Amino acid sequence: MALPLPPGLTPPEIAFLCEMELVTVIPRQRLEGLELLGGRIKPLNPPHRTNVPLWLALLLKRQRRANILPPPWLNSHSLTAILDHEIDHDETFSPPPRLPPQPSANTLPTSPPFLSDNTADAAPDALPYHWLEIGEMLLEAASDDFEDPDNVRKLLRGLREVRMAKLRSGVEVLDAGGGVKMNGVGGMEVGEGRAFVTGVIDGLRKIAASREQQRRDRDREELENGYSGTAADYDDDEMDMQ
């Protein structure tokens, strides 16, 4: 008998979707354009930069046909500034990249993976939705394209720990009817924290249901014992009669 699938996307599935994100490559040799489901890939002409899906960039890197240009936010200086922001603001996450302006009212807004949040034109001070997956994949496959890969890896690890601790602390203070602001949370963070968050919410629901059942039992016992109201209710009735 097959076990039931967990709710939501698993971390491997999130990483798979991340491979559709656009990154910038510097080709080493000329390659013809490709017609893909996500759109047409322009011909690669060295040394001109080109934006391609992450999966294609990783393939070209393994074949030594291109180098990958890390996005501006994925360097030591930018990650240090973002980490300082995360530490200084313990109740909010660093703001995500701004969405591009909508061309017209008749067109749909652009969304991942068709944004330039991980290309060479990305903002240097904002973490995109797939920041953790992008960073780990690029460091694993193209560490030689980074100026200081060890420090970048260390900063990514620090960012992950600080943000996950912030996510847990925000969920722990919830009550049955409360909420937590999660603007700026990344895809892998949602996937990894889903079990913890759902566990806390389920616990709050059980506590609320138990309290409601206790209240109903107390009301039923009071009715069975001939309870006719509190002193405050008696005073209110007396004032109405006057």
UniProtKB/Swiss-Prot annotation:
InterPro entries named in the record: GINS_A, GINS_bundle-like_dom_sf, GINS_Psf2, PSF2_N
Comp. bias regions, Basic and acidic residues: 212-223
Classification via CDD domains: GINS_A_psf2, GINS_B_Psf2
Primary subcellular site in the record, as a coarse category: nucleus
Gene Ontology biological-process annotations: chromosome segregation; DNA replication; double-strand break repair via break-induced replication
SUPFAM superfamilies: GINS helical bundle-like, PriA/YqbF domain
Compositionally biased spans, kind Acidic residues: 233-242
Single GO cellular component term: GINS complex
Keywords associated with the record: Chromosome partition, DNA replication, Nucleus
Location(s), subcellular: Nucleus
Family that this chain belongs to: Belongs to the GINS2/PSF2 family.
PANTHER family referenced in this protein's UniProt entry, alphabetically: DNA REPLICATION COMPLEX GINS PROTEIN PSF2 (PTHR12772:SF0)
Protein name: DNA replication complex GINS protein PSF2
Organism of this sequence: Phaeosphaeria nodorum (strain SN15 / ATCC MYA-4574 / FGSC 10173) (Glume blotch fungus)
Lineage: Eukaryota, Fungi, Dikarya, Ascomycota, Pezizomycotina
